Amino acid sequence: MSGQLRDTTGFLYEIGLLKRYKRTGWSQVGVPLPESIADHSYRASVIASVLAAMEGADPQRAAFLALWHDSQETRITDIPHLTKNYVSAAGNEQVTGDQVAGLPAAVAEMISAAVAEYEAARTREARCARDADKLDCLLQAREYAEQGHSNVQPWIDSSLAALTTASARQIAHEAIAQNSLDWLERAKRAAARAQ
């Protein structure tokens, strides 16, 4: 087996850790089975594409940036904000560089460029992806609040304050105003009318 093929396969196994690693901040407030990092990255990618379409940016690029935004957490895990005051971790671009070392050049460049663009936050797509990260956190906090976890308001407040695009702020305010399952009731009524 070639070294690049071995390293690429190993990288794909490494990325699988994101399905098992949990978002640690939720555990701090008593959520017994918090979402995984992969759960978060998936919905953030969907949100990024929606925001980009609403903002006139490239939905595919925004979703792609969001897809890679937490890939470094296979090595540094999801470090809670309080913990960041006491420990330091390598920057995301450095971690990504270590992760992609040994991969085919085209693959390494694709991933490194996506992470660099996301971190720089200069493109509309990167801003949409970064807002998607925060908006997913807000949505998740609202869902956990509805399940009885009352200590999540700081996540809602900080996520809302961090949003930079008009579309993300509008969706956030709507998310705060409605129940997370209101869509289901609307869908049931629409299905009943269609029959």
Task: Report each predicted region and the residues it spans.
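Active-site helical microenvironments for divalent-metal-assisted chemistry
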Residues: 1-195
